[in-house]
Amino acid sequence: MGRRVAVFSTAALALLIAGGAWMSAHRFHPGYEVGEENERENGRPPVEGDYWAVRLAYGGDPQHLRFEPTWMLESARQDRAIAEAVPTGRRSYVRSAETALALDPDAFTLLGPMPLRGEGFGADSAAGRTNVIVSDPDDPAIAYLGSDGGGVWKTTNCCSAATTWTVKTDFPEIASMAIGDLTVDPQNHNVLYAGTGDLRYGSFSFGAAGILKSMDKGETWSVLGQDVFNPLYGPSTNGFPQYQSIGKVVVDPNDSDNVIVGTKTGVFFSYDAGGTWDGPCFTNAFSTSTTAQRQDMTGLLAVNRSGSTVLYAAVGTRGLPTPVQPDLANNGANGVYRANMPSSGCPAVADWTLLTNGFPAGTGSGAPNTSRGRLEIAVAPTNPLILYAMFTDVTTRGILGIYKTLDGGDTWASIGAPGSPGSQMWYDAGITVSPTDPNVFFVSTVDLFRSTNGGTSYTNMTDAYSGGPVHPDNHARAFVGGDPQKLLNGNDGGIYFVDNAISATGSGNANWIPLNDTLPTIEVYHGDITANFATAATSGVNAGFQDNGSATAVFNGTPAATSWNATNGGDGIVSRIEPVLGQRWYYSSQNGNLTVSTNGPNNPEASASGAWSGDVLSFVFPFDIYRYGALDVAGSGCTSAQGCTHLIAGSNRVWETTTGGVSGSGWAAKTGNVTKNNLILGGDNRSFINNIHYSVSDPTVAILATNDGNVQYVFGLGAAGAATAVNVTGSNAVLPNRPMLDATTDPLNPLIGYAAVGGFAQNTPSRPGHVFQVTCSAQCASFSWLDKTGNLPDIPANAIIANPNIPKQVFVGMDWGLYYTDDISVPTPVWQRFEGLPHVMVWSFTIDRGFTTLAAFTRSRGVWAWPLPVSQGGGADLAVTITPPDRVTPGLEMHYSITVTNNGSDAAVNVQLASPTPAGLTFGSNTGDCTTAFPCVLGTLAAGETRNVTTSACVSRTYTLPAPVPLTASVDSDTTDPVPGNNSASASAPLVLSVFADGFDCL
């Protein structure tokens, strides 16, 4: 018998009825705050650049972060050993009678964004970053793209606003969905290769997982070289571990068996179409010199010269170190190298020729420099002797120079360069030459530029930050059907098409069309869903996106993939929704900048930040709202008048407000520093809170996870003065001293908690594991930990949450997907991977008020929702609903009906129904299955049985507030209820004022 329940509002989204009015207000003016900042210019975000290294390689000593590639290979073997099954509830899901909608119980439902609208750039349709594009040489209607984390996508109806995309790489063998390059075999257009990993030096780039190969025009794929192209590689002496990635893949135009791959560690060769590999091979002698120079391959060409294949390899190490990749300053090998295609093995260094004639002095000399950074190369399809090369400038991060050769690279001449390329050319770069004219080429920068005269002058074809039609930060280009007018362009906002690429005089009359309407590839951090998401007639969602701000979506009916509407810019981080009234929608951007809309899912109109800017805090600053409180119960944090008003946030200490945080009001530091304060990298302190959550059942209790390995409980929240933080880390005697990425409590018992742990077990060999359970006595005066990792793969666990309907069912979001156990209580839980969700990084979870839905927020594959299963073990699942009157008129009697249904498999004994009369009204009578005043004793309800009660009340002629009139009801019994979330309900009725001449009430 469970009497402690939450009250869930069926009117929580009253504002949603207004529909489109939300979406028309506050259009953005283009600028860096629209969608993104000048985002990776300093090489540091997210989390100031080193979060990638820390979350993988920290093991208690910040000066010795450690990673070995073999660890990931072993993790992949562990992952393959997990049975590809689904949660018990997925196949025997019991849908309650109130579930009128149709979220798929057998798989997660994609919610989008598909696409993102209103972010402020002219095309008004965005997706996530596109790294590479290929147009099919045989059929211009077929095109492929590679996402930075969402896999390979294909269209067969390119290129119009009606273009549709289908992902082709959702299969269990792929452990990384980051695609660095795509290429079609020049001799067999049915064959494609995709290189995994992201070469662009981003702080949060994903590593490689092999070469993908398709032999049927991208319909199916196999994985090659998993043991060769490891996701990461070990650090240099006293350095950080760094990620491997495949930035270039080319096929010998004269022999399809020869495949050449450019990576962050050199060149690899296959002479059997990817079956086996030789490498890494080096174009120079500086890979093993006293001060080893990096061998990042940012350019790779296999050029057909009258039946002979000539290779060009561009070493283009960025040159500017980052906290993640400190040896990027070792760029002394940067330059263009040429060799003939070998017949086997690695070409000897002596077989490569460094091309220097006309390039800046010192190119490829082995001496690190502050000028020559990333290097891009391209060949003219109509003349194999004409090539272009573009150096970025290490110091300015712009273009150092563009060079052209007419003799296959023997001599180079400097030509002009675009005048305003931006200052992140280490990130936005690339050249593609026209298929018909060697003097026409396009250059990717923040914008896309065109030259029609061999580089003498350039035209800006996109003008993103001046109201242009295309998203900024361009990466990929592909001509369609060999037509120089028809160009596909990929950038941080997805993919775009223009059919007058040559004849347009500029961005103003270029016929750009976004092709993003079916491309859900945005990188998502944290988000939220509205109350009773799976059952409400109108529901909503919001989330924050890397590079693309924050956004919302509203569903009238069953939630499904749809377009979202941007609300604010920057790097969107955490978003939350007040669930009772649906008025306050919270958003945040990098480093703890919180904002709020107080009139639904509109653009924020007020700051909601506290005074934490001087604290040590995460780029991905966490905050949460307590959403489960019973309405109008003292201390619950939720009222019918104000909704839920308790919010919590984490820097290196805990902050809370009990007034909704509007205009920053009410935030107060509740604790001191809850970290170890010892994760210091150089001069940067990385000891901060990664995640913080209220307990499900008690708003006075919270649990938090820190980057430096702490888990702490916080007691005494919701009251004035300081709260009490209790460190339950236990000196890491059981809990590993690795990054704690998330923590949550048991839905019923707040003194039972769970921690999701990052890193790898090899860094804490005596304390392995990724999921741990803590059990506390009162106020955690004593506590004990248990390792619940079971058969989970040894990869970072990013998020953890338990099903409030079945508390033993726990979900974990990892780098390779979503895993679950149906029984966390056993000593060694059995975990399985949920195959109804793509195998991508799951960054965070949320469960709605009402316990109907689990939402998962993923990197580069959007937002997903799944109807939470209910208990399969019997019990009486009592559900109560209220049908309010169409209107309430002062001076007249009102009537509302209450329905109680037993959706469980067992009879409910001693059922009691309560419905307090709203203030200002006078109870009249009950009819139907109850004829007494409340509480009504309904007796025993058999499985499937329903009781109906109609209540009348008199509304005083002087009644004015609250309006609308709030109505609540709750039901209970002596029988265990496995789904307490539907034991209570609320609704509201609109107040319609009227004048009565008789002056009497309810006559």
Where are these regions (language model features)?
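Bacterial Sec-dependent signal peptides at the C-terminal "C-region" and cleavage site
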Residues: G19-F28
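Exported/extracytosolic protein signature
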Residues: Q872-C1002
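N-terminal Sec-pathway targeting helices
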Residues: M1-A11
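Short intrinsically disordered, low-complexity coil segments enriched in acidic
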Residues: G2, N369-R372, T881
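Exposed boundary/loop context
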Residues: A12-L13, W52, D483, A537, ...
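Beta-propeller blade termini and top-face loops
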Residues: R27-V870
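Hydrophobic membrane-insertion alpha-helices, especially the h-region
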Residues: T10-G20
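Intrinsically disordered, low-complexity segments enriched in Ser/Pro/Gly/Ala and basic residues
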Residues: F8-S9, M23, R95, K213, ...
